[in-house]
Amino acid sequence: MKAAGWLLPLLALAGCGPGAGTGADTGDQVARGERVFRRCTACHTIGRYAGDTDGPNLYGVMGGPIGERRPRFSYTAGLKALGGNWDAARMDRWLANPRRMVPGTTMAFAGIPDAQHRADVIAYLATQGP
């Protein structure tokens, strides 16, 4: 029991530091993500009932299935073959360089090189859905 005496203080500190965001930090990140996402609206919509354009509507994309979420949208075979769901790690890879993640994708966007901007967009996308 004595050896575990350090565990409680360690657990208390686990939520401290730069990685521990406050609600305000999260709100700021979502707002930044919304601003960065404006570039995406050249091809994507994000409204609950909005249709697809050159790209699929991204409402509810986070947590949704990859390459099959919008039945009327023509996803590439490469994207369909990925399988699984969009989580933060996969979305980060996709936003960094879609063509590297899925060779043959028809998404013309080259990617978002800045990791913070990608994280901001992912935070925004996570708020846009059920």
Where are the language model's segments positioned?
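Stable alpha-helical elements in mature extracytoplasmic
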Residues: 29, 36-39, 54, 87-90, ...
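The canonical Cys-X-X-Cys-His
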Residues: 33, 37-46, 121-125
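C-terminal capping alpha-helices of c-type cytochrome domains
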Residues: 85-130
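Electrostatic cytochrome c docking/interface patches
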Residues: 16-37
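Processing junctions and N-termini across compartments
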Residues: 10, 34-37, 101
